[in-house]
Amino acid sequence: MEPIEQQLTELRTTLRHHEYLYHVMDAPEIPDAEYDRLMRELRELEAQRPDLITPDSPTQRVGAAPLTAFNQIRHEVPMLSLDNVFDEESFLAFNKRVQDRLKSTENVIWCCELKLDGLAVSILYENGVLVSAATRGDGTTGEDITSNVRTIRAIPLKLHGDNIPARLEVRGEVFLPQAGFEKINEDARRTGGKVFANPRNAAAGSLRQLDPRITAKRPLTFFCYGVGILEGGELPDTHLGRLLQFKAWGLPVSDRVTLCDSPQAVLDFYRNVEKDRPTLGFDIDGVVIKVNSLALQEQLGFVARAPRWAVAFKFPAQEQMTFVRDVEFQVGRTGAITPVARLEPVQVAGVLVSNATLHNADEIERLGLRIGDKVVIRRAGDVIPQVVNVVLSERPEETRPIVFPTHCPVCGSDVERVEGEAVTRCTGGLICGAQRKESLKHFVSRRAMDVDGMGDKIIDQLVEREYVHTPADLFRLTAGKLTGLDRMGPKSAQNVVNALEKAKATTFARFLYALGIREVGEATAAGLAAYFGTLEALQTATIDELQKVPDVGIVVATHVFNFFAEESNRDVIGQLLAEGVHWPAPVVINVQEVDSPFAGKTVVLTGSLSQMSRDDAKARLAALGAKVAGSVSKKTDLVIAGEAAGSKLAKAQELGITVIDEAEMIRLLGA
């Protein structure tokens, strides 16, 4: 080995050691200035001999070139989410379900951790070297963020120690400490940059930078909490044991991990963490509770999207008091007019809240709310701000009543409130710019026509400039016309045109959902498409015929019938088809020719399945001639009840409908 190679090896080993002491052990031995000096020395030597630079060198955390787009990484082991509980009663019920499933009266040993409010990531090590990293994504596929994760100093590029598996995928949370968050926003305000609403958004935005050099400047950190792939090695047989092993290999683990030997001990841990929450220095939104024994975890297994052996115990939504300065009225896709309270800005659960929905006139009346009132604001689920109540004892002398508009605030059309409905609606239809915008945004959304790259701001400009009036107009757009929009260059414009062309090939169900018929969500659209098969059959269906579709009652049937009875709607559909929107011809299943116990039956799935996903079960049932519905009614022939089946099972029993379990379903599917 050359002297310079020896020097490089020693420097890298020294720097990794001090990174471990700083980020994992929280016990630095040297000042930052000395660390910086060692890093500079390493950089200078590598500059002399670039052929000796290794991928796991501490200098390689910031060297990747900017990405043009994120590639996708498929998770070999799905990244499942956790079920939630929100109060002690729900947790105790969860504890009992676990004990019942284990057929044990002895207390379970629980491993309790903090529920970090950051971004879940998967990091793959091969022979101890970091080779890839990905976001959770949809649980099956995530975004490749390897270059950015390599810039996070808390994450070792190379594990140290003995008995490291050949392939080890660790999972954890990337997050931003509050001090770092405040510094980022302080710098942004000074330079006119983006100010983030909360540390989680800042962490997500930092991790998804196309230029890793920007990520490297953000003080992100990481805690490890689990494992995915494990090949060519072994891990301890308890969750806590695994976390301690990860820490020994150089991976950071929270110091607030605790074993609890009873439900009461778990509740004590929860209360202590909630009390300490303001002083932790980073955001959490609850605690995570896991069965410590891996053998018991395997015995308990999984439901469709979550393990049975773990749960997230969320903290209550945080509340603050503030004043209502005004109330404005927004118009939605279906003409619904929603009152929105404009508030004196206030921090609630780490977010600056300045608006809150008031839902409708009935809610305003229920609250007894007036403009100028002092109110209690809650972020329900830590996401959607809402007004909880009015502080009547502190009502100011000068308050004003909230007057609901008699005409649309956008287009001036009359408003109406149908008897029996809480919602007031604009009658303007597509002549209303607000409805047009929201309808088009729905039309191009991912679960509808899925037009990649056509965001809300583009739709807003297209409507405001009178370029687009109906969904069909979207497919007539040219790159030249789009290039005239704000922040839209020729390449971006052509990408949108290409995406529109690609979106023309869709499915009947997606097309129906995209049309935005009132009360027709994805499931109902799929049911209508499966039942009628063709657009022609659906357009000519009567209200009685529509009600034969599972889950379609008189209200939905009337909305669908009225939509297709409207000449302007039929005209838009004709234009869409003329522009080339199409979908595959229906596969007609003749139930008389299908030899299956499910043929011609209306079937409802309820509860959690353990042997296959709900979507797989629906697809297999439909292939055997079943009509899969979402709710139980007198038209239901069969209910398949998985774990934790609830009200649907009770209703089926009340109506005397045949009920089978998952095992029987699987037997019949193979019959």
Swiss-Prot record:
InterPro entries: BRCT_dom, BRCT_dom_sf, DisA/LigA_HHH, DNA_ligase, DNA_ligase_AS, DNA_ligase_CS, DNAligase_adenylation, DNAligase_N. One of its GO terms (biological process) is DNA replication. One of its GO terms (cellular component) is cytosol. HAMAP family: DNA_ligase_A. It is an enzyme of class 6 (ligase). It comes from Salmonella enteritidis PT4 (strain P125109). Its cofactor is Mg(2+); Mn(2+). SUPFAM superfamilies: BRCT domain, DNA ligase/mRNA capping enzyme, catalytic domain, Nucleic acid-binding proteins, RuvA domain 2-like. Zn(2+) binds at residues 408, 411, 426, 432. PANTHER family: CHROMOSOME TRANSMISSION FIDELITY FACTOR 18, DNA LIGASE. This is DNA ligase. Its EC number is 6.5.1.2. It catalyses: NAD(+) + (deoxyribonucleotide)n-3'-hydroxyl + 5'-phospho-(deoxyribonucleotide)m = (deoxyribonucleotide)n+m + AMP + beta-nicotinamide D-nucleotide. DNA ligase that catalyzes the formation of phosphodiester linkages between 5'-phosphoryl and 3'-hydroxyl groups in double-stranded DNA using NAD as a coenzyme and as the energy source for the reaction. It is essential for DNA replication and repair of damaged DNA. GO terms for molecular function: DNA binding; DNA ligase (NAD+) activity; metal ion binding. Keywords: DNA damage, DNA repair, DNA replication, Ligase, Magnesium, Manganese, Metal-binding, NAD, Zinc. NAD(+) binds at residues 32-36, 81-82, 113, 136, 173, 290, 314. Transmembrane segments: none annotated. The lineage of its organism: Bacteria, Pseudomonadati, Pseudomonadota, Gammaproteobacteria, Enterobacterales. Residues 593-671 form the BRCT domain. Belongs to the NAD-dependent DNA ligase family. LigA subfamily. It comes from the Bacteria. The keyword Signal does not apply. The active site is at residue 115.
